[in-house]
Amino acid sequence: MYKMQLLCCIALTLALMANGAPTSSSTKNTKKQLEPLLLDLQLLLKEVKNYENADLSRMLTFKFYMPKQATELKHLQCLVEELKALEGVLNLGQSKNSDSANIKESMNNINVTVLELKGSETSFKCEYDDETVTAVEFLNKWITFCQSIYSTLT
């Protein structure tokens, strides 16, 4: 009696695992897409750190939201939702060392890459943490997120 239920449960588990498990080619593609995303985030962090002290301290007064638990590619939607605000802050703090064309290009690259990574799924709703973070913390956390996802794909 229980044998049949156990076999059904095992079959269902195997079916779910097979459908949810990424293939090696999709893992390879995901890794390839994560690399430029990581580089663009690092470039933006470098831009933020390039600002003169007065600009940087003013920029750090702006706060950004992070998702409560970012563990999957779908959480990149939360990055996209805060990206426009980040671009505004970076453009406010323009200095001689910074190039707005590079910032805009990085923002566009991030948007395109995130769309490719998360797919066209738009129904995901971000649950944000109550605490806000600075631009530097925001970028560092997303860099760490990408590195974490990348390391799980290896």
From Swiss-Prot:
**Cellular component, GO annotation:** extracellular space
Source species, domain of life: Eukaryota
Broad class of where this protein is predominantly found: secreted
SMART domains, alphabetized = IL2
Arranged from A to Z, the UniProt key words for this protein are: Adaptive immunity, Cytokine, Disulfide bond, Glycoprotein, Growth factor, Immunity, Secreted, Signal
Q: Which cysteines are joined by disulfide bonds?
A: 78-126
Q: Which InterPro entries match?
A: 4_helix_cytokine-like_core, IL-2, IL-2_CS
Please list which residues make up the signal peptide.
1-20
Entry keyword Signal: yes
Q: Which GO terms describe its biological process?
A: activated T cell proliferation; adaptive immune response; cell surface receptor signaling pathway via STAT; extrinsic apoptotic signaling pathway in absence of ligand; interleukin-2-mediated signaling pathway; leukocyte activation involved in immune response; negative regulation of B cell apoptotic process; negative regulation of inflammatory response
Q: Does the keyword Iron-sulfur apply?
A: no
Q: Where does this protein reside within or beyond the cell?
A: Secreted
- Which terms in the Gene Ontology molecular function aspect does this entry carry? cytokine activity; growth factor activity; interleukin-2 receptor binding
Which residues, renumbered to this chain, are glycosylated?
23
Entry's family note: Belongs to the IL-2 family.
Q: What does this protein do?
A: Cytokine produced by activated CD4-positive helper T-cells and to a lesser extend activated CD8-positive T-cells and natural killer (NK) cells that plays pivotal roles in the immune response and tolerance. Binds to a receptor complex composed of either the high-affinity trimeric IL-2R (IL2RA/CD25, IL2RB/CD122 and IL2RG/CD132) or the low-affinity dimeric IL-2R (IL2RB and IL2RG). Interaction with the receptor leads to oligomerization and conformation changes in the IL-2R subunits resulting in downstream signaling starting with phosphorylation of JAK1 and JAK3.
Protein name, UniProt field? Interleukin-2
| Source species taxonomy | Eukaryota, Metazoa, Chordata, Craniata, Vertebrata
Name of the gene encoding the protein in the UniProt record: IL2
